[in-house]
Every structure is written in C-alpha cells, then in structure tokens.
From Swiss-Prot:
Record family assignment: Belongs to the short-chain dehydrogenases/reductases (SDR) family.
Oxidoreductase found in the keyword field: yes
List of residues binding NADP(+): 12-37, 280-304
Enzyme Commission number(s): 1.-.-.-
Organism: Sinorhizobium fredii (strain NBRC 101917 / NGR234)
Superkingdom assignment: Bacteria
Keyword entries, A-Z: Multifunctional enzyme, Oxidoreductase, Plasmid, Repeat
Residues annotated for substrate binding in this entry: 141
Highest classification ranks of the organism: Bacteria, Pseudomonadati, Pseudomonadota, Alphaproteobacteria, Hyphomicrobiales
Leader sequence residues: none
Name of the protein in question: Uncharacterized short-chain type dehydrogenase/reductase y4vI
Active site: 154 (proton acceptor), 420 (proton acceptor)
Length: 548
C-alpha cells in the first residue's frame, strides 16, 4: 500500500457495507485510520459490524431504495459529523439470472430502485455535506458495459450508474467534488457463491474466460476504490475503472486461460507482496509526463532506467535521481536500438518489473497531414511503441506490468489530428491485445490516458486546436489542466500490487474531459467555485476543441 493514500480521520460512508466487497471496503478504510460509516439493510449485521469496529466508527441500517431513509441518513450524518469526505455507493442486488420473458416488472423496477436510483439519491444527499476535495466512488459492474443473457435488469441498472457517474462528475466538478466508478468483473462474494450453489453460474468456465485465470477477491475491488477516493486521484473524475482481470480484452471463441484442476489460491487470500525494489524502464522518460513518472518510481526506491531520444536530458534526470538510476539514448523507430536496449537490461537485471511506454507528442493540423506525415508519426508513436512492448514482454516474469501512455482525446471525434487519434486508438488496442495474450503468464497491461497536462506538449496541443489557455480550461470540468505528477500517481498505482486484478483497462486522467460531451459544459457553475478554478466564460461560445 502507498502510504500517501492514507489520509487519517476522513469520514467515509460505505453503503452495502455488510457483504463481500462492502466488508472489504470497510476493513481497508478503517485500517487507513479513516472513520467509517457502514450502511446496509436492516438485519444485515451492519449494526454489529459497526460495534465490532468500535468508536468512532458507526453502523447504520438504511434501505437506499427508500427516499425517507436516505434523507434521514443525511440528517444523522450532518448531526454527527462536520463533513463527509468520501461516499462509496456499493449497495446493490445481483442478477436473478431469470430469462427476460420470465422477469416480472417488479423485479426489473427493484433492480433500478436499489442499484441506480438508490445510489443517485444517496449521492445527492451526501454531496450536501461535502466540501472541495471530497470524492464519490460508485461500484458499478462489467455487466454495465457488456451485454449478457439473463441479466437485463441488473445490466441496465449498472449501465445507468456508469452514465450518472459521468454526468455527476461534470455537474459537481465546480464544487471540487470528484465522481468516479469501478466496474468489477466476477468477484468471489457471497452473491457469486450463492449463484454458484444454485447452479446458475459456472465459475470454472469464468476462470477460463479471464486472461488472469481467476475471479477477483473483494479486497482487489476495494483497493481500486481506495485509490480513486484518494488525493492521488485528484485529476480523475468521470472515469470508470474496469477491474476484470482482462475479460473485456478478449474477443475470440474459446478460453483465454487454460483449465485449472483446483481453485487458485489468490481467489481466497492475497499473496504476499514482494517489497523488493523493482526495475522500471520509462520510455520517453527524460521530460514532461515521462520524467514525472520516473521520479515517482524513484521516490519509491525502485531502480529506474530512463530511455529517451534526448540522451542529454535523460542523463541529466538520472543524475538528479541518484547513482543507481540509468539513462540510455534510444530512437525507438530504429528496431536494432530497441532490441539492444532490452538485451542489455536483461543481461544486467535478469528481468524487468515495470515498463512504461511513453510517447513523443507530434502534432500537425489535419489540413497539413499528408500520408507521408501520417506514416512518420505512426512510426514513432505506434510502431515504435509496439517494438518496445514486444521486447519488454520478452524481458518480464509473472507479476510484471506494461503501462502504455495514451490520451483521453483520442476518443473524441474532434481529435487534434488524424494521426493523433489513430496512434492513441492503436495504443489502447495494443494494451488490450497484450492483456489477453500475456495475462495467462501473469503479466498485466493497462493504459494511462491523460487529458490536457501542464507540459510543453499540452501547449502545442492547444495551439494546434487554436485555443488560448482560458478556452482550454473551460473545456475541462475540473476547470484546470492537470499536472504531470497527477498522471504519475495513476501510473504508479496501476503498476502496484494494489492493482493486481486490473488488466487491459484504460484509466482516464483528464479532469473529466472525456465525460464532458460538449464544449463549455465542464465549467458550468453549480454552487460556489473559486476564481482560480473557474475561468472567465465567453457568452454563447461553443468551442471546437480540436479543430484548427
């Protein structure tokens, strides 16, 4: 665990606290030194849970589908605490696994009332007690992103929760409240155990479908929630982090992992964490976001290799970080240079623990992009990235991690250039394909997708888009550009043991940019907001974010 995620004394409200994931959430936040308000249904054992935790923790019986209960909860919280720092919306009911034709209307409505309307109601009431810096994390589901038979009500409710996560993130950003979600795959909870006992779920078949070869433990979901609720996720809002072992990265018939004779031990107990210093290589690590990532791993005591086309800057940063860190000048468009680099590192270290695949921002307005320019940019940022991933994978062992740096803007149809959108989309797919391929070997992959970050590259991006700094900030719900260190924190988390079930996922570190569907929404005033956070708006302006 990263000690910097621990902010003792925060008041954390956890709904659905008495069951699987909820109990793991309670345990993790309480261990952090936070004050936990555990909320669940009557007769769920939540009162006893609160009593066992002891003062100042609290257990409360609340039915989130009843508006009167939720209003009463807010009144009690207001009386007992001066403020609420974090809400985790975890209350929910699982799928009945009944066919659509056999699903009663009341059952469909009940799923919506608890999983969606209840979560929204609790968020709205609790937000009244929140100050800038507070966070709401919704526990959604992979079912809200992928269709499956016999899950109509459950899937619809979770898809709605993911959508509300985005809209609330935009609405409350001006108040300094972040809203995010996690989307777990299959988790070893009492809910899943009951479905398995009833013969409605074949867990052995699920394991074969997951590249990592197992279902998740509740604490793996709780650790992802803890990160999203922490100060280290300060530029993440509106994002949904998929925690599925790589399920979404597989799109082919048959299994993603070979059948296993016994239940993997990691489903029941968290393996012992290797606390030895890791060997980390950061490609493009000499300046900007890459340099911030290199510094973050170095702070942890890891050995960092800074590889960059700018050898002089790489040497300078390695010198600042300390004697054990290395620098190498590498042109990743030259295959032989990349191969030689990784051969040298394998010989020196034996294996690599983390590879961070940075990129060189090359921005040309769409009107100036010839096929030759497109190819040149792809050679650097996509083909070169592929070569690095290929060689890094050869150098890794079970437990190693590959992180690719992409961009949230690549998902916008108004990308700043054809090449920019193309290579970032390619990077995301490279992450997913390698997650499916390397997951069975115990190697995880993920994409970190920054939005506008305070670097020279961000200034060039704005220039290509034809925007000044005020216009740029208006486009971002949080009302500011991010810092390179905020991207580094996301990368550090994804490479950590706390992210052990995250594989093939993309994490947007963009201040809510990708959740904002039209220009100017992000800086909409909704309550008090400081002048620093709120740039001056231009009346009737509709910014064409990325068109020159």
């Amino acid at each position: 665990m990263d000690d910097r995620q621990v902010q003792p004394g925060r008041v954390i409200v956890v709904t659905g606290a008495a069951g699987g994931i909820g109990r793991a959430l309670v345990d993790i936040f309480a261990a952090n030194g936070d004050v936990v308000v555990a909320v669940d249904l009557p007769d769920s054992g939540v009162i006893e849970l609160g009593q066992n935790l002891g003062e100042p923790h609290l257990g409360l019986e609340v039915d989130v589908s009843r508006e009167d209960d939720v209003v009463a909860l807010r009144a009690l919280l207001e009386k007992r605490f001066s403020r609420i720092e974090v809400l985790v919306n975890n209350a929910g009911i699982g799928p009945t696994m009944a066919a659509t034709a056999d699903t009663a209307l009341e059952d469909f409505q009940r799923a919506l009332a608890i999983n969606l309307v209840g979560a929204y109601s609790v968020a709205c009431e609790t937000a009244k007690l929140m100050k800038p810096g507070a966070a709401i994390v919704n526990v959604a589901s992979l079912a809200g992103l992928l269709g499956n038979p016999k899950r109509s009500a459950y899937a619809a409710s979770k898809a709605g929760l993911i959508s509300i996560t985005k809209s609330l993130a935009c609405r409350w950003a001006s108040r300094g409240i972040r809203v995010t979600a996690v989307a777990p795959g299959h988790v070893r909870t009492p809910m899943v155990a009951e479905l398995e006992r009833a013969g409605k779920l074949d867990v052995s078949a699920i394991r074969r479908r997951v590249p990592l070869g197992r279902i998740a433990r509740p604490d793996e979901i709780a650790r992802a929630v803890r990160f999203l609720a922490s100060a280290q996720a300060s530029y993440i809002t509106g994002s949904t982090l998929v925690v599925d072992g790589g399920w979404m990265s597989v799109n082919q018939p048959g299994g993603a992992h070979q059948a296993q004779d016994r239940t993997p031990g990691a489903e029941f107990m968290r393996p012992v964490e290797d606390t030895d210093a890791r060997t980390v290589i950061v490609m493009g690590g000499a300046t900007g976001v890459g340099a911030a990532i290199a510094r973050r791993f170095a702070e942890n005591g890891d050995t960092v290799v800074i590889a960059d086309g700018d050898g002089e800057e790489a040497v300078k940063l390695a010198g600042l970080l300390g004697d054990k860190h290395l620098s190498r000048r590498v042109d990743r468009t030259v295959e032989t240079e990349v191969v030689s680099l990784f051969e040298e590192l394998r010989e020196r270290f034996g294996h690599l623990d983390v590879f961070v695949n940075g990129m060189n921002e090359i921005l040309v307005p769409n009107t100036e992009e010839s096929p030759e320019v497109l190819k040149r940019i792809l050679d650097v940022n996509l083909t070169g990235a592929f070569t690095c991933v290929r060689e890094a994978a050869i150098s890794m062992r079970s437990g190693s991690v590959i992180l690719n740096l992409g961009a949230s803007l690549s998902l916008s149809p108004l990308a700043p250039s054809h090449a920019y959108g193309a290579y970032n989309a390619g990077i995301d797919m490279l992450t997913r394909c390698t997650a499916a391929e390397l997951g069975p070997l115990g190697i995880r992959t993920a994409t970190v997708a920054p939005g506008y970050i305070r670097t020279c590259a961000a200034n060039r991006l704005a220039a290509v888009a034809g925007m000044d700094s005020a216009s740029l900030r208006q486009r971002i719900p949080l009302g500011r550009v991010g810092d390179a260190e905020e991207v580094a924190e996301a990368a550090y988390f994804l490479a950590s043991f706390d992210a052990s079930y995250i594989n093939g996922s993309i994490l947007h570190v963009d201040g809510g940019l990708i959740s904002s569907r039209e220009a100017g929404w992000g800086s909409e005033v909704d309550g008090a907001i400081s002048a620093e956070m709120r740039p001056q708006r231009r009346p009737a302006a509709r910014w064409r974010l990325l068109s020159p």
